[in-house]
Amino acid sequence: MSKKPKVGMWSGLTAVTAVLTAGAIVGTTVAYHYTTTVNNYLDADTYKIIKGDSDEDTEYFKSDFTSDEERESYEAELCAQVEAEGAALLKNDNNALPLASGAKVSLFGHGSVDLMYGGTGSGSVDTSKAPNFKQALEDQGIQVNSTLWDLYSSDDMMKNYSRITPAAISDTLEANTQYAVNEAPWSKLSSAESSFADYGDAAIVVFSRSGGEGADLPSGENGTNDSWIKGQEGDGNYLALSAEEKELLQNLKTLKDNGTFKKIIVLINSSNAIEMDFLNPEICGEDYGIDSAMWIGDVGQTGINGVAQLLAGEATPSGSLVDSYLYDNMANPAMYNFYTQAYPNAADYNLLTDGPDVQGMYSVYQEGIYLDYRYYETRYEDAVMGTGNAGDYNWSTTVAFPFGYGDSYTTFEYSDFNVTESADAFNVTLKVTNTGSTYSGKETVQLYFQSPYTDYDKANGIEKASAELCGFAKTDILAPGASETVNITVDKSELRTYDANNAKTYIVDAGDYYFTAATDAHNAVNNILAAKGYTVENTDGRMTADGNVALTYKWTNAALDSTTYATSETGTAITNLFDEADPNKSSSEPGEVTWLSRSNWVATFPTQPVVLNATQTLADHLAFTRYDGSKADSVEMPTLGADNGLALVSMIGADYDDPQWDTLLDQLTFNEMVNTITLGFHNTAAIESIGKTRTKDENGPQGLTAALTGGASAMCYTSEDVMAATFNVDLINDVGRCIGEDCLAMGYSGLYGPGINMHRTAYSGRNFEYYASDPFVAGTICAAEVNGIQSKGVYVYLKHVALNDSESSRRGVNTWLNEQAAREIYLEVADKAVTDGGAWSVMSGFNRWGAYWCGAYDNLLTGFLRGELGMRGMIITDYSGSSKYMDLADGLIAGSDIWDSPDPTIHTTLAPKYENDAYIVTEMRESMHKILYTVANSNAMNGWSSADRLKVITPWWKTALYALDTVLAVLTVLCIWRLVVAIKRKKTWTAEQAANTVNAQNQQ
């Protein structure tokens, strides 16, 4: 043997192939473990359709567009229109807006080059194709200072002075350390200062704030300290102007005073209400010289084009605020209990924090029904009338811009207000006239009512707001001098209130009810005060302005009615369902809460967080699993795996109670049910036994987005608050239709959205995903959007039902409130979306109602959603992963149907123990009924005929990974074999070399 065997080479190759094989096997194991996630990300086929002979028209849901290009072009214009109709003009001194044609402007603030298009987390959107602000303005003929733009856009500025927001979903209060305004100091703009005079028609400042999933915004109060605003001077309040932003305004005011700039315009690019003290010199102590201000929310993909149209006068503002904007956000009574806290004695009961899951954290909705304007305007009325111990409350130094406020470039006059009563409704007409001389525009008409606050209410702990929105309408574009009569119908059920302590159902109080048409909630209360005889003069100036009696109507209810609305439209008796979420009534007995009450504002206004304590009963209720198996034999085991030959396509349009469903459900196997129910992450599984296709479900509060799962995304519309601020039902119905079109075009059948939680405070991380602080406008707009989405065969999952109004410690937080607040505020959006919009499905949430996870709270899911509202579709959990408290058995029993989880832990370890539990298997079967009923009536059935069948297949990536593992394993074995051979040969070669050496020495 002449050549030395290559032991080193084969040793190295063996090591490499062994490592690669081990890595591949580990990777394959992980990928197989998260099969659902990988299938979603790769959009991998898990089945094939075996086509039968049929000439049926199987396009059950059709597109209204002839091409993707036509759809995308239409949607781009639609998004801009939503922004143009939703943006609210707050201030416009001396007609600073619109800008003159060809105006030359300078854009200031980091937000000008880095707009907020939407928030972060599961609702985040792809904005790679979105126009920037400069492009949008230039398209309107406005010239933009390129020197300043390039400076803000430079690598140095983007690196050092970009706002800091949570980069990923997190779940703890500490996540807020990632928030920072981080505006550039004025000194950093010096290199562009010489360009200002040439672009001095206006200085346009953009103040942006970001929210995101998993992290609430810091307020600087209740433990949220100033370290959370990294490197910035300030008090830790993310929604106040930072020192650098104030410095920017100060310097612009100086330049305005010396003639460099003619006007200063501020745009509020945020879905979280920024404190507005800087717009009022009497409040903040400094005049920043701001001429005009406009709230634009989060603009979506093309909404900035709508903003540019407004600034250029191509469109006239007609949006109305869906939150009250304050000078100091701590004036909101909800702020004192907004951030979660721990039970002081949680450790005594071993209430755990298990990863992100929590047992011992809680939040109290001590403000009750007094959310946003329901507080500000009610306490104002009491202060005017001298009732309710309102104290020294001063509306004018509290509220900068009331709920519903929105100015215009023109003026409108209301006249001929008329209300007629029918058996079930009030029918309102109002003439609206454009009294301006220059600009055409739309006007939003808002209708409010006031319910009497009676002795019965005071005796029974019922609270009443001084004004509640009960209807609205938006005119067409009115030219100067033109008029339109709008019609608004108010169902009499809007007048009901919930009596949780005596009648324990909905009542309509005896007494006088007032209706009024108004431009905002504050004017509504002034109109009602005027109808009661109050004026600025006879209240010694406590009234901010005289109201208009001509825009009011009084209706008197002779006697208290506790029967008309005591039964829902489904025939279900309505009575208390949520006592367990009320600390004063819960069997957990965590402590007493004094709810905010207009019977005595001063004595009941929160001044510090409510302290509750854990009890043994509370700890028992908080157990991760409550079902003990005792009902296993209480029912007969349902039929499984029958060969009935029925396919899901045969059930299209079938009634939920059709007997054929039992025939179909009998065909399911236990494993098919478990696979579908426990692995519902962004899909419902393919089922061979009944020919059910796999569906794709995706996020979408602002439009279809696969930001988290890696699939296709579509048009990103404005944030939901901008949609609501349009007060335009038809427009948002069209948005919904187009979202449905996107889903139809991209193969999605379900949408995780719209978001239906409330703007409880300005600091919730996900306010951009939710419509408003008022449940009426939120519910009405949501119902319109839902109707549009589902018209294209896309089932919505309303999220989240309910009380997911904050992000801190959200996984398992104990949420406490009273039933009146639950029903009148926090469940009202779901009510309207289901009953008026026809929403198929809902997503529950991470939170608990009291001690009960909302996905395992029977009274919420079965009692309210299915019983009172009649919802027939499926209920999905929020992302469950391996969260222990989102228990399978408890959830199924309460009414949850499918777990938003890619983790097969439940599938492989938990579910099998119930295979012989007839009670749980029966609950699984009923969940499958709801899932299949929903899917059968969706666009998932497009292309399916009654003759088609389905075959479940192994997705290509599994085959590829198996092949890769096999090839690497074979290579490793070959390398090992060659290494062994090489080692043996080396021994022989070494011996030969030694012998040759000896022979050579002997020959010498």
Predicted regions and their residues:
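Glycoside hydrolase catalytic-domain context in secreted enzymes
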Residues: 1-498, 507-515, 521, 569-1004
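Terminal connector regions
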Residues: 492-565
